[in-house]
Amino acid sequence: MLKDPCALIVRKETWGEFCLLALHSPKIARQAAPGQFLMVKVGNESYPLLRRPFSIHSRDRNRVEIFFTKAGAGTAILASRNPGEALDIIGPLGKGFRLGRTKATGRTAFLVGGGRGIAPIYFLARELRSRGVQTRIFYGGRTESHLPLLPKLVEQGFDIFVSTDDGSLGFHGFVCPMLERELARLLNTPRRRRSRTVRRPEIFACGPDAMMKGVAEIAARYRVRAQFSLESIMGCGIGACWGCVKKIKRAGRAGWVKICEEGPVFKDTEIVWEEA
């Protein structure tokens, strides 16, 4: 974990309520891994008092990017900041996606991003592809305008499946039925049925709780592993305030853990999903 009080905004993109900021912070960029997050002081004054958590959307040698929606006073202030201004950030924080060190031969990953949940999925997709993993991205939103990163994903050649709640683009409906259809199609190919050595795909997801609960049910039904990046309000991001607890089950026992410290990424078998 590092603190950079002068992370310079070097690029800004906006699409309605969505915003992307690229920050020059070489030390943090070099340490960042998919699924980790930053705690950002959004303004220069004492208000808002608390930092805001943001998934790391991408990184290169010198920069990290965050992608977010203007959902309240804090994110509205952050979205008003411009290139040339500096932000006070802390990171990278949390435990990211567990990718392992095994060879990528035969591996397939299904990545599911709902709305702003696409933020960490993009970083993960680039990392998996660099390792030779066959990557499929399932990107869902309320309407076509809520899929602002789609052109970038298409341009970079990812295998993408799109859904919108209103049917304005792609599959008409939620992302889960589309995910299940493609998962069943993959697992039922003759080669998959014959082979005992080809690995089953793994699912990685981030988005609304209802979506992720649905993805978890699909993963259990098809006996595939899954990891989920949970979103939560956070007061500190370092485990001091207990403001981001989630019930997690390990070794047959459920208990409350801090998302910022133990997560934000958890295995599907660990999460105790609340009733919708």
Predicted regions and their residues:
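Ferredoxin-reductase
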Residues: 2-85
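Structural signal for conserved beta-strand scaffold positions within catalytic alpha/beta enzyme cores
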Residues: 11, 58, 162-164, 228, ...
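FNR/FR-type flavoprotein reductase catalytic core
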Residues: 73-191, 197-233
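Short microdomains enriched in Cys/His and/or Lys/Arg
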Residues: 258-276
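Local cysteine-cluster metal-coordination motifs and their immediate loop/turn environment
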Residues: 209-210, 231-264
